[in-house]
Amino acid sequence: MLKKTFQLKVAALGLSFLLPSLASAACYDDGASARISNYCALDKIQGARVDLRTVQFIDYKLKQEGMQRGLGLSTPVAASTTSKSAYPILSYSDNINGGNSPEPLVLGNLSFDGEKELYRREGVVAGLGASLNGRYIHGEGRYLNYGLNASYAHSPKHGLGIATGSANVSSINHIRNWWFVDAHANTSRVRKDITDDTNSNLSIVTSKVFEPSDNIYSEASFGVNRYFAESYNQNQVLFGYKTIHANSVYSAFNLTVGDAVENQLATKFALSAQLVTQLMNKPLKLSASYSQADGGMLLGFERSDETYNISVSYPLWRGLTASVGYRTTDSTIDYFDMSTPTFEFQFSSYNF
């Protein structure tokens, strides 16, 4: 990394030949991590003469990641930063109250009808969220990220609300030669009219950023996670592979494999993929996921679920992004089958 930085600083002295935001356009894709974007940017401008604005931008991005020298510019970056924000919420929920399916529960020759007041309610919810995020840089390539988030969304149709809260902290550590070891902890709670669910995760992940071929930049990761639900705990293995392609398309693949948990419906494996490309100079995101959970038992009957999800999001105009998709769950117990459209409007947050 030091070699790249030195060559870049020498090249940046000659500003007569400008490359208009080359690094920004090619490397800082929406969704890409800062580390893979920085690696890409440094490689893109090796031996090239770039405009001062681009140099300042990359210098700032490097210093944000704890690379204290950056590109050698004198512009300081505070070791400790915090930000507060608020944002509106407008989305569709297929289960606003945490209720049950209106269909009868059929187990063999037995059939059970639920109480109508406990049926799930669906519809549009609107509300407000607020967050506090911070970063503390405590060493070369080492920093802590932390955040708190709370939100409330209400359904005017049903007179019901969904309250959520979450907290997270991450220790990010660049070891050497673009090897990283990170530790993450998070917890979240979702309160509805009928249900109140809490879960937490504690993980350690190692990753490597590299260039598998010319103008292709990747980050491979491997880690372990301990998942804490209210009724069980589970060990999980994590795999990830992210790439900025030569045509500036960004892709990400993640795989989670979980241990079997006796008499509990728990993740067996989950696979997700994301593709980000530019459409009319705006990021078009395509996302898909598949998960399989097994081990569940209900009155002596085994339960396993398969869930498919696909969505697309695109900025409609400044400060507003629309996301639409479809999710379906196929269960060995038909009562838990579900198919539903999904949509959400994501608004830019107001920082204060």
Language-model segments: residues:
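Transmembrane beta-strands of outer-membrane beta-barrel pores
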Residues: 88-94, 136, 150-156, 185-191, ...
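Residues on the lipid-exposed face of transmembrane beta-strands in outer-membrane beta-barrel proteins
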Residues: 88-90, 126-136, 150-152, 167-173, ...
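Outer-membrane beta-barrel "beta-signal"
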Residues: 321, 325, 336-352
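Repeated loop/turn-to-beta-strand initiation elements of outer-membrane beta-barrel proteins
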Residues: 137-145, 174-183, 210-220, 245-253, ...
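Detector for outer-membrane/organellar transmembrane beta-barrel domains
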Residues: 199-296
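Residues that define the transmembrane beta-barrel architecture of outer-membrane proteins
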Residues: 122-128, 159-165, 196-202, 231-237, ...
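Outer-membrane beta-barrel initiation region
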Residues: 26-168
